[in-house]
């Protein structure tokens, strides 16, 4: 059971730019792993239930992850899982849900977060990104993965094409594309809460995670 009965809190771990990415400078993968493990310990000390590993600093990124990014994310994810087996571990390889699932399955992570995109299409700074639910389903079947897939609905940093209501998009992701759970994020605290209420009404039994925007000032209200 991944979630606690009352509330489960995750912290994002976003390593320094990985070798091969545009913003990478001098750090080796060993340097980056050491930084990540130090950050993970801080997260544990502050009482979080889990972490989501994301290579956010590798921007700009198209949809298909580079081979080196997949390799380095696998190394980092393995080190977290090995050193902190009690932590819930999610994997998010920007912006490639197929790569995320491959990494997560290899290191026995607890779930995958698919952001940009699981269903539909989004306009982003890197162009139009298209849903990967078909490819993800095929990989799950092919490798017989049991890693749950959690999908972002209407990702906040892109513009969804088609204008589908948030609750309809959520229903589609679960019942037509077979996401195990959802991430929901608005551009403000108020929008996030409004979106979550709409999704929860449509999908009362589906796990829903607030995907971002929490800080020291609003975390109590969001919880």
For each feature predicted by the language model, list its residue ranges.
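A charged helix-plus-loop insertion that forms the helical arch/lid used to bind
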Residues: 68-73
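Alpha/beta enzyme core
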Residues: 10, 15-63, 74-87, 96-206, ...
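Extreme N-terminal starter segment of soluble prokaryotic enzymes
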Residues: 4-9
């Amino acid at each position: 059971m991944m979630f606690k009965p009352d509330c489960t809190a995750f912290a994002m771990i976003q390593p320094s730019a990985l070798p091969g990415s545009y913003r990478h400078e001098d750090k080796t993968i060993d340097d980056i792993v050491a930084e990540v493990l130090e950050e993970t310990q801080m997260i544990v000390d502050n009482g979080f239930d889990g972490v989501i590993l994301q290579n956010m600093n590798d921007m700009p990124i198209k949809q298909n992850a580079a081979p080196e990014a997949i390799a380095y994310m696998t190394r980092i994810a393995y080190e977290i899982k090995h050193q902190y087996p009690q932590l819930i571990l999610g994997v998010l390889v920007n912006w490639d849900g197929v790569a995320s699932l491959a990494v997560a399955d290899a290191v026995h992570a607890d779930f995958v977060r698919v952001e940009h995109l699981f269903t539909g299409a989004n306009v982003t700074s890197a162009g139009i990104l298209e849903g990967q639910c078909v490819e993800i389903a095929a990989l799950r079947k092919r490798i017989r993965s049991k890693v749950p897939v959690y999908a972002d609905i209407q990702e906040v940093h892109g513009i969804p094409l088609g204008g589908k209501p948030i609750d309809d998009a959520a229903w589609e992701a679960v019942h037509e594309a077979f996401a195990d759970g959802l991430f929901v994020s608005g551009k403000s605290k108020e929008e996030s809460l409004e979106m979550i209420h709409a999704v929860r009404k449509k999908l009362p039994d589906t796990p829903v995670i607030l995907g971002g925007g929490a800080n020291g000032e609003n975390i109590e209200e969001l919880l």
